[in-house]
Amino acid sequence: MLWPLLLLALWAWPSAQAGDQDEDTAFDLFSISNINRKTIGAKQFRGPDPSVPAYRFVRFDYIPPVSAEHLGRITEAMRRKEGFFLTASMKQDRRSRGTLLALEGPGATHRQFEIVSNGPADTLDLTYWVDGTQHVISLEDVGLADSQWKNVTVQVTGETYSLYVGCDLMDSFALDEPFYEHLQTERSRMYVTKGAARESHFRGLLQNVYLVFENSVEDLLSKKGCQQSQGAETNAISENTETLHLSPMVTMEHVGPSAEKSPEVCEHSCEELGSMIRELSGLHVIVNQLHENLRKVSNDNQFLWELIGGPPKTRNVSACWQDGRFFAENETWVVDSCTKCTCKKFKTVCHQISCPPATCADPWFVEGECCPSCVHDGEEGWSPWAEWTECSATCGSGTQQRGRSCDVTSNTCLGPSIQTRACSLGRCDHRIRQDGGWSHWSPWSSCSVTCGVGNVTRIRLCNSPVPQMGGRSCKGSGRETKACQGPPCPVDGRWSPWSPWSACTVTCAGGIRERTRVCNSPEPQHGGKDCVGGAKEQQMCNRKSCPIDGCLSNPCFPGAECSSFPDGSWSCGSCPGGFLGNGTHCEDLDECAVVTDVCFATSKAHRCVNTNPGYHCLPCPPRYKGNQPFGVGLEAARTEKQVCEPENPCKDKTHSCHRHAECIYLGHFSDPMYKCECQTGYAGDGLICGEDSDLDGWPNKNLVCATNATYHCVKDNCPLLPNSGQEDFDKDGIGDACDDDDDNDGVSDEKDNCQLLFNPRQFDYDKDEVGDRCDNCPYVHNPAQIDTDNNGEGDACSVDIDGDDVFNERDNCPYVYNTDQRDTDGDGVGDHCDNCPLVHNPDQTDVDNDLVGDQCDNNEDIDEDGHQNNQDNCPHIPNANQADHDRDGQGDACDSDDDNDGIPDDRDNCRLVANPDQEDSDGDRRGDACKDDFDNDSIPDIDDVCPENNAISETDFRNFQMVHLDPKGTTQIDPNWVIRHQGKELVQTANSDPGIAVGFDEFGSVDFSGTFYVNTDRDDDYAGFVFGYQSSSRFYVVMWKQVTQTYWEDQPTRAYGYSGVSLKVVNSTTGTGEHLRNALWHTGNTEGQVRTLWHDPKNIGWKDYTAYRWHLTHRPKTGYIRVLVHEGKQVMADSGPIYDQTYAGGRLGLFVFSQEMVYFSDLKYECRDV
C-alpha cells in the first residue's frame, strides 16, 4: 500500500513545486515569449510531459522575443541571484548545432550572451561579451544531439558553468567573468532557439523551457526528484533500482499570462511521506536477510537429499538420483559419447557402448559419436558435421540437430544436410505448471513448381515441452512459407503487328511494295519456340500504264520544278532561291542590294558580298564580335541579319584585372578598352592589388607592378593615416601627414613656424606665426599666406595681386587676371569678376552664394539645373554642366551639331571635335580626329574623369568657394580648410560653424567618392559632403554624426541629431542663418528648410582614428541616388536606391558642422553623362 502512495507523491511534485514558486523565481520562456500553437513556424508535438505541448520551429524569423517587461525582471533576477538555471526537455536532431537561449542587442547584430548545443563537436558552448571582449566556454562530451529526449539543467551561477542531464553531472567549468552583472535590457531582445545566423538555429523539439532562480543546484535537482548522497536512508532507497525509476522533469508555473492551476493530487504531508520512506527502508533490510537465510536452508536440504537418496516425497517411489537430477524407473540416458545408464530399482546401472567392426579401410571419427563411420562414395564433398545444438527441451524428451554443407558444383552430395536425434535432460516434473515450447523447424520442403516462382514450407511442433497444468501454448505459427525461385520457364515467340506498306517502287507500269513484322511480342526466351511464318510480305502495285512525260528533256532552269501533263505538255515553277526569272530562264539575285541592312555597316563600304547564288557577310570589324550569316534568297536575307557588338572584356570576363579589382569598361573605341581599379580596402595598379588599411589609395606594402607602373604600387608612407598625396618634404620615408618633424630641423611640427622648410632658429619678424624663411610677406602680418598669382609674393604685400600688370589700386578685378579691364555696366567691377556684368552693382552682394549677384538674380529656373533661365544655354533641358564645345551659345544638350562641323550628332563619328571629312582609318566608327581623346582636351580618355567634357579633366578642389551657412553670431568660428595633393585632399582643422567648401566644376550625372577620417578624439559632431549644390539654399548633403546629441542652441527650433549617416535635401526659404543651422543639425524634416531622404537605421556613428570610404551615385535624369559607406573592406552603410528629382545636378563640395580635424582624402569625381 505504501508504494502507490510514494509514486503518487513524486508524480505530483512538479505541480506542487510550481505553485510554491515565487513569481520571479521561475519563468516559462514559451509563455512570456507568447509562443503557442498560433505562432507562425511553430509546430506542436507530444513530448515526455503530456500536459503541455512540445514545439519544433521551422520559421525562425517569426519567433517572438521575450516581452520587454519580463526581460527586465529576468536580468534583475540574474543580478540579484548571481546567475540563473536553464531547464528544459529537449530532443535535438542528430549532429546538429543550434542555439538554446540568446540575449541580442543593443545593436542589430550584437549578442550579449548565448547558449549553443554543438552536435558535431559534442559540446555545450556558452558565449558572452564583457567590455567588448568575447569569451567562449565549452562543456565537452555532453551527448545532447542524438535525437533522444533529454532533461537538461544548465547552471550559470557565481563562477560556475555546469550541465546536468537527468540527475547526472556531465561537465563543469569556471566562468572568466560574471557577465550576468552587465546585461543590458534597453533595445535588447531575448530569444529561444533563434541563432545569430541561419545555420545556428536550433533543430529539434523543446518542452518546458524555464529560467529558474534557485539558491543552489542541489535544491533544484532535489525538487526534480534526484536523490542526494546525504544519509543511510537515502542510500537504502536508491540502491533498490527495481523499485522506482524517476524521470527528472520539472513543470513550473510560468511568469506571464495567468493560467488555470492544476488540481492538487497528493493529500499526504511531507512528514507522512518521510515516515513511509523510513518504513520501506526497514522492510528492505528485512527482505534481504530473509533471502540470505532461505538460500542457506536450500543448500542444507540439497546436502541432506544426497545423503538419504532423494527428497522425502520420492522415498517410496522407484527412481534414481544422479548428478543432481531424478530419473524414473527404466529410464535410459547418455552420460558421454560411449556410456549409457539406466535406472533399475533405485540403482543407476551404466555400461559401455560396443561398436561394430568398421567395413572400410579409412573409418572416420565424428566428434560427439562413440563409434567410427565409413564415408560412402555418395557422401564425398560434404564438410564435417557441425556440433549438435542444445537440447530443445529443458526436461523430458527433446531433439538436437546438426548440419553440414557440400559443394554441388563438383560433387554428387548424396545424403541429408541436417541430422536430428532425440535427447533428454531429465524427467519433467508433471506436478508444476509448464508453458509449451516450439521444436526445431523441419527442413524446408521442395519448391512447389519446377520453373518460375513457387513456395517452400517448413513446420514445427509445440512439444518441446508440451504445455501442461494449464500452461500457455506456444506463441506464433507452426508453419512458415517463403518464395522459391526455379529456373525460368520457356517463352514461345509471337509476331508483332505488320508494318505499313512501303511506297511503291514505281508510279506506273507495275511495281512492288512490301511490309515486315518482327518476332518480338514476345521474343523466344529460355528455350521457347520461334515464330512460325515469314517476316516479310510483298505484293504488286501501280499496275496502270505510264503517261508521256514532257519534263524528260529538262526544259526548266536547274532547281526550278517541272510539271508534266497527260497530253505531253509541261510547265516550270519559280526560279530557285537566289535567282530571278520565269523558271525557264533565271538570273542571279543580288541580295546585298535589295536588303541593304543584312550585314553590319560601318562608315566605310557595305560589308555584304553577293555570290551566284546567295550572299555572305564579312567578319565583324576589329574590336567587334558577332555572327557571320550567309544564305540564298531574300527570305534568308530578311530573316537572319548580322549583329556585331563591341567587345567588352569586363562583361566577357576576359580582362586581366586582379581578383580584388573592378574592371571598368571604357568603350570599344578606347585602347585599351578597359581599366582596372582596386576595390575599397585595396590599392595598386588594378592588375596587382594589396591591402590598404587607411583607404587613401596606397598599399601597406610595396607591390611588384608592371614595368614603369609605380603609381599606387609603392608602400604607403603613412599606412594608418590617409594622405593620398604621399607628401614627404624631408624624404625620410615618413609622410608629412604622420611625420612629427617634416623638415628635420629639430622643431616639432606643432611648434614649427615653417613646417616644410629647415629653420631651426624660428625667426618671425611680423609675428604672424609664419617663419621668415617661408613667409611670402615676411614684413607684413599675413597668417593666411594667400598668393593669388602663385608668384611667391603674398597678396598682403603684392602691388599686383593677380599678376595682370595692372596695379591693385587701378585694377577693377584685383584678384582675377584681366588685362583689358572691361567694365560693361560701369560699376567699377570688371566683367571678369562681376557677378552681374550687365547690371550696375558695385557692392557685389550675393546672399544665396550662387555666384550670381542679387541685383540680377531672379532664381527662375524652369529645368531645375541650377542656372536661371536668362543665363541657361539650354533653358528647357537640364544641363547643369553647361557644356558648349562649339561655343555657339547653345549648350550641347540642346544642340544637334555640338562641334558645328555640319555633321549631325547622330551621324558624327567625332561629336565634340570638328571633322567634316569623318576620316576613320581603322573603320571602328570612331573618327581619327577624336581617337582616344573624345573631347580633345589633351587628356587621354582612360585618364580623363570627364571624357565628354573638355572643361573637366581631373579631380581638383584647389579652387573652391567657402560657403558659411551660419555667417552671423559668435557661436563658433568659420571652417579652416587646408589643401593637399593638388586639390584631391582637404583637411578641415577648426571646431566651426556649419560650412561648405564647394568646387566650381558643375555636374549632371556623377560618381563622387572619397576617404573620410577624423584625426582627433575631442569632438563627436557632423562631417560629410554636398552634391547638386546650386546655392546656399538649394543642395543635397550627406552628413554623419558620431553620437546622438541635442543642439545646444534651442532657438529658433529644437534640433535633435542622431548618430549615423543621413541623406538630406536642403530647400531653404530663409537661406543661411540660424534657421538653416538648426534644421541641418536635426535628424528629420524641418518645414521650409530641410527634408531627410534617408537615415541609416543602424545609427552607427563614425569612430575616431578610423578610415571610411564613401561612394555617391547620382543620376538626376531619373532621380536615382545611392550612398555607400565602407569601413575597411566591408560595407558599413548602404542607402539602397533613393529617388528624388528636386535638383537636376550642380556642384560638389565638402561639409563640416562643429567637427575639427576632418580629413577628406583621395577625392575622386567622374562624369557619367551619356
Curated annotation (Swiss-Prot):
InterPro entries: ConA-like_dom_sf, EGF-like_Ca-bd_dom, EGF-like_dom, EGF_dom, Thrombospondin_3-like_rpt, Thrombospondin_3_rpt, Thrombospondin_C, TSP1_rpt. The keyword Lyase does not apply. Keywords: Calcium, Cell adhesion, Disulfide bond, EGF-like domain, Glycoprotein, Heparin-binding, Repeat, Signal. One of its GO terms (molecular function) is heparin binding. Residues 731-750, 841-944 are annotated as: Disordered. Residues 923-933 have a biased composition (Basic and acidic residues). A motif (Cell attachment site) lies at residues 926-928. Residues 318-375 form the VWFC domain. Glycans are attached at N151, N316, N330, N455, N582, N708, N936, N1067. Residues 958-1170 form the TSP C-terminal domain. It comes from the Eukaryota. SUPFAM superfamilies: Concanavalin A-like lectins/glucanases (SSF49899), EGF/Laminin (SSF57196), FnI-like domain (SSF57603), TSP type-3 repeat (SSF103647), TSP-1 type 1 repeat (SSF82895). Gene3D superfamilies: 2.60.120.200, 6.20.200.20, Laminin, Thrombospondin type-1 (TSP1) repeat, TSP type-3 repeat. Homotrimer; disulfide-linked. Can bind to fibrinogen, fibronectin, laminin and type V collagen. Interacts (via the TSP type I repeats) with CD36; the interaction conveys an antiangiogenic effect. Interacts (via the TSP type I repeats) with HRG; the interaction blocks the antiangiogenic effect of THBS2 with CD36. Adhesive glycoprotein that mediates cell-to-cell and cell-to-matrix interactions. Ligand for CD36 mediating antiangiogenic properties. This is Thrombospondin-2. It comes from Bos taurus. The gene is THBS2.
